[in-house]
């Protein structure tokens, strides 16, 4: 199919992460559709034709290979200890001959346009248990097409008194 010169887009209908690195390298695009339901065909046609600009983000992580599993975005790296405990690296393994980063990480997603973030304001750098923090950010569509952006913010407990088991 690729030899025809036409763009090849993978529509991945799945309910879980899969190891799809070889397939994505051979394709020009990838759209994870999940299980779209009875109107999924029309919705996908709108996205593929450019009539609708996708703005979703992954709620899971797609591993690069089976050797990276399990990959959890919110668990301590007990099975893959960091060489430098102060490192912000998410994943580390001394046994894989492959990059430590997954193929597609939790929260990734693309759009037909571009956005810039500016003027980030956080009400507090430290948050006590049960307290609230207010965050403001200016989001600007810098592309040539209309679109929506999913703004994501993650907090990390650097020094937790208790951690959840994996």
Residue map of PLM features:
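Catalytic core of soluble alpha/beta enzymes
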Residues: 2-3, 21
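Secreted, periplasmic, or luminal enzymes acting at the cell surface/secretory milieu
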Residues: 13-148, 152-156, 164
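A short helix->loop->beta-strand "cap" motif at the edges of active sites that frequently abuts
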Residues: 3-8, 27
């Amino acid at each position: 199919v690729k030899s025809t010169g036409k763009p090849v887009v993978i529509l991945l209908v799945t309910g879980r992460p899969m190891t799809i690195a070889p397939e994505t390298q051979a394709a020009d695009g990838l759209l994870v559709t999940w299980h779209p339901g009875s109107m999924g065909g029309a919705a996908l046609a709108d996205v593929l034709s450019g009539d609708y600009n996708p703005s979703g983000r992954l709620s899971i992580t797609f591993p690069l290979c089976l050797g990276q599993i399990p990959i959890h975005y919110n668990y301590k790296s007990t099975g893959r200890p960091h060489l430098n405990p102060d490192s912000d690296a998410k994943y580390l393994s001394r046994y894989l001959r492959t990059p430590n980063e997954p193929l597609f990480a939790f929260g990734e997603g693309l759009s037909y346009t571009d956005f810039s973030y500016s003027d980030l304001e956080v009400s507090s750098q430290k948050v006590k248990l049960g307290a609230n923090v207010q965050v403001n950010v200016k989001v600007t569509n810098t592309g040539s097409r209309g679109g929506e952006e999913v703004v994501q913010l993650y907090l990390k407990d650097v020094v937790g008194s208790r951690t959840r088991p994996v």
